[in-house]
Amino acid sequence: TKTLKNATKLNKGAKVFLHPVKNPKLYGIATIKNKKIINLKEKPLITKSNLAVTGLYFFDKQVVKLSKTLKPSKRKELEIVDLLNKYRKKNALKAEFLGRGGAWLDAGSIDDYYDTTSFVSTIEKRQGFKIACLEEIALNNGWINKVVLNESIKFYGNCEYAKYLKNLL
């Protein structure tokens, strides 16, 4: 989409994509004021916001350096929210909203995973197109040619995915 293509042009700072959710306690949540992220918290018990951090991020070249400064959280994990907060504190974090008409699905639990796979399967069957077929995206954008696509088809062998790719030729 145009929004994603614009995000790939990011030269400085970071960009995070947000989407409203019903149960903010299950996600990393952003609080926005005057179109700026003023707070980011992982799985907050109390929050005034319902804007989930979707897991779609764009970073500048500083991301590796900043990542190396992260410390494990109480959950003994390196948290993406901590990295995003480093950008926020430098006033270098931008937000983009995935609004109505788009689909963002979390697959953090077994039930969520089932719902996500069912959704993707239904859309693919009804429309006859794969969702996020990397070879198809690359071919359509001119990043690969049909020779490279043919190599992928050989790699995948005799499976449904390879048959789908053959139809792109």
Kindly label every feature range from the protein language model:
Residues 1-34, 58-61, 65-70:
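Conserved beta-loop-beta/alpha segment of the NTase-like Rossmann-fold superfamily
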Residues 8, 36-136, 143, 147, ...:
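Catalytic-core segments of class I nucleotidyltransferases/pyrophosphorylases
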Residues 143-169:
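Short, amphipathic C-terminal "tail helix"
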